[in-house]
């Protein structure tokens, strides 16, 4: 059952945000949605941070006839993991994206035209600094919890390390302290796909470079799955529409990737895809520090980590490295390795595997 009807809101900030690169971005719009009610002491707010191609549309529908609910609808609502009878849940779109927050599709106030590649390179840390502005606007001094998976988990880590006084707890799923060379190389190939689409025009396109973006999405989508899940869903079955010996005949998995890729281009912008891919590749929770221990030294909040056995994009060993560093420092840390065949996307597809563990963790949080 869906959460119900929701409304997206836009917060505009006339301030200028100094980015990690040293460049200035402003004014800034941040798209966000809220669920539940902020209590009188303003102490029950949970910020959910989205992954690479996510949005602020966490749960519910914008109208009765909308076919798809928000991207994590199942965990939000009365009696759900993020119980809206108990918590005030917030989800905001990151800067650099194309779902309402300031990004390369936004109008550059200096030129009156779209930023496109004039938009500055942004980092996950910059995303979180922008979110802090939103929390200030909402009058929330300290969050009960920050919860996110993948790039959302990176944001949760940044909250815990950069704003420790503002975080009561963090739940981090399927993430990494820093993407590996393999993860970066896969994003590099996805970038090439867009760069080599003649319709990209060095970012100055009027129509989305669909072929390049669809291919880039296909590459990315493979990294979100696992061999086990792909075998279970497709195996080596040949498409019933094609002759096996037709030169352009496709396996079912090929048709799936084609459909998924071209469906994606109708809802996402190519330049935003590139900017967020760059932010992922640049991510390092220990940026500016000599070690993970130095990076995690400011942490005061308890952190609950989840890794998934078949996640080969951000494998469990990368989460375990962070857990070990936090334990060395004597921090409050909890770790669960979830057996799953669904790869990196397990945190989105199998929330029931970790829901009771997160509920128990949140019950023990003191803010």
UniProtKB/Swiss-Prot annotation:
Major location category of this protein: cytoplasm
Pathway: Amino-acid biosynthesis; L-methionine biosynthesis via de novo pathway; O-acetyl-L-homoserine from L-homoserine: step 1/1
Domain of life, per lineage: Bacteria
Keyword Magnesium: no
Enzyme Commission designation: 2.3.1.31
One annotated Gene Ontology cellular component of this protein: cytoplasm
Localisation per UniProt entry: Cytoplasm
Binding residues for substrate: 217, 345
Top-level EC class: transferase
Keyword vocabulary terms for this entry: Acyltransferase, Amino-acid biosynthesis, Cytoplasm, Methionine biosynthesis, Transferase
MF annotations from Gene Ontology: homoserine O-acetyltransferase activity
Active-site residues, record numbering mapped to chain: 150, 311, 344
Record's catalysed reaction(s): L-homoserine + acetyl-CoA = O-acetyl-L-homoserine + CoA
Any one of the GO BP annotations: homoserine metabolic process
All copies of domain AB hydrolase-1, residue ranges: 44-350
HAMAP family per the UniProt record, alphabetical: MetX_acyltransf (MF_00296)
Quaternary context: Homodimer.
Function noted in UniProt: Transfers an acetyl group from acetyl-CoA to L-homoserine, forming acetyl-L-homoserine.
Family statement drawn from the similarity comment of this UniProt entry: Belongs to the AB hydrolase superfamily. MetX family.
Name of the protein this chain belongs to: Homoserine O-acetyltransferase
UniProt organism field: Citrifermentans bemidjiense (strain ATCC BAA-1014 / DSM 16622 / JCM 12645 / Bem)
Protein encoded by which gene: metXA
């Amino acid at each position: 059952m869906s959460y119900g009807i929701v409304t997206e809101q836009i917060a505009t900030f006339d301030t200028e945000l100094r980015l990690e690169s040293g460049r200035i971005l402003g004014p800034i719009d941040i798209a966000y949605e809220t669920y539940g009610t902020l209590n009188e002491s303003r102490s029950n707010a949970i910020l959910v941070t989205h992954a690479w191609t996510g949005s602020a549309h966490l749960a519910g529908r914008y109208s009765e006839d909308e076919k798809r609910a928000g991207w994590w609808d199942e965990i939000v609502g009365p009696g759900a993991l993020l119980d809206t009878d108990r918590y005030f849940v917030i989800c905001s779109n990151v800067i650099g994206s194309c779902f309402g927050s300031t990004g390369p599709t936004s109008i550059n106030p200096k030129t009156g035209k779209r930023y496109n590649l004039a938009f500055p390179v942004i980092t996950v840390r910059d995303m979180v600094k922008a979110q802090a502005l939103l929390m200030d606007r909402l009058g929330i001094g300290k969050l009960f919890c920050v919860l996110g998976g993948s790039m959302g988990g990176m944001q949760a880590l940044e909250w815990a390390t950069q704003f420790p006084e503002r975080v009561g707890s963090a739940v981090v799923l399927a993430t990494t302290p820093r993407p590996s060379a393999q993860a970066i190389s896969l994003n590099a190939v996805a970038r090439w796909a867009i760069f080599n689409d003649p319709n990209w025009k060095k970012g100055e396109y009027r129509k989305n470079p669909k072929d390049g973006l669809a291919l880039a999405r296909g590459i990315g989508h493979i990294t979100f799955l696992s061999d086990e899940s792909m075998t279970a869903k497709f195996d080596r079955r040949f498409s019933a529409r094609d002759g096996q010996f037709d030169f352009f005949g496709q396996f079912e998995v090929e048709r799936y990737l084609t459909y998924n890729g071209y469906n994606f281009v109708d809802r996402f912008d190519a330049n935003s895809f590139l900017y967020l891919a760059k932010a992922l590749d640049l991510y390092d929770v220990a940026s500016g520090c000599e070690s993970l221990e130095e990076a995690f030294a400011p942490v005061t909040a308890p952190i609950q980590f989840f890794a998934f056995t078949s996640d080969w994009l951000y494998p469990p060993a990368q989460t375990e490295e962070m857990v070990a560093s936090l334990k060395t420092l004597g921090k409050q840390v909890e770790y669960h390795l979830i057996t799953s065949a669904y790869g990196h996307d397990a945190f989105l597809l199998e929330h029931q595997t970790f829901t009771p563990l997160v509920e128990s963790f949140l019950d023990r949080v003191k803010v």
